Amino acid sequence: MVVGLFGGSFNPPHEGHALVAEIAIKRLGLDQLWWMVTPGNPLKSRNLLAPLAERIAESERVAADPRIKVTAFEQALGVSYTANTLARVKARNPHVHFIWIMGADSLQTFHKWQKWQEIARTFPIAVIDRPGATLSYLSSKMTRTFDFARIDEDDARVLWKKPAPAWTFIHGPRSGLSSTAIRNGALPGAVG
């Protein structure tokens, strides 16, 4: 089984997140995508963070595809930081092939994540295009560090077979929705 792991605050979740999930399922040939709602992000302020239960419920409404499973692994496992969560999820599911899914907009700060290089050396990574990040991903520390491990997006369906580090950038439809803009009132409605 091939499973995409798509983590984030989802504060609030919106159709742009659902689009990233759908692109990942289609282009990577995923059997499932686990939408991992985090209790909090150490790189973001918690002042405007909606309660976890609310973000999970909203994520379930947005993620209409039955192959998408909304989870709260970090809370359930009692861990924080993506690297720790992913290590525990992998240890509990040794026969599953995982791919870490991230929006291209997250690449500019990925090198600030705890153990970011360990994540890249443990999981193949699929970076999904986001507005404003189509070219900026080229200058990210992750893509420069692991440039040798990039596979062509035409081979995205076999990314799960590649030993990490391996990553691809996937172009496709993009949504201009942004959780930050929705919270700031610049864009309407969080849920789809």
Swiss-Prot record:
Its EC number is 2.7.7.18. Pfam families: CTP_transf_like. The keyword Transmembrane helix does not apply. Catalyzes the reversible adenylation of nicotinate mononucleotide (NaMN) to nicotinic acid adenine dinucleotide (NaAD). It comes from Rhizobium etli (strain ATCC 51251 / DSM 11541 / JCM 21823 / NBRC 15573 / CFN 42). GO terms for molecular function: ATP binding; nicotinate-nucleotide adenylyltransferase activity. NCBIfam families: nicotinate (nicotinamide) nucleotide adenylyltransferase (TIGR00482), PRK00071.2-2 (NF000843), PRK00071.2-4 (NF000845). It catalyses: nicotinate beta-D-ribonucleotide + ATP + H(+) = deamido-NAD(+) + diphosphate. One of its GO terms (biological process) is NAD biosynthetic process. Pathway: Cofactor biosynthesis; NAD(+) biosynthesis; deamido-NAD(+) from nicotinate D-ribonucleotide: step 1/1. Transmembrane segments: none annotated. Keywords: ATP-binding, NAD, Nucleotide-binding, Nucleotidyltransferase, Pyridine nucleotide biosynthesis, Transferase. The gene is nadD. Belongs to the NadD family. The keyword Transferase applies. It comes from the Bacteria. This is Probable nicotinate-nucleotide adenylyltransferase. InterPro entries: Cyt_trans-like (IPR004821), NadD/NMNAT (IPR005248), Rossmann-like_a/b/a_fold (IPR014729).
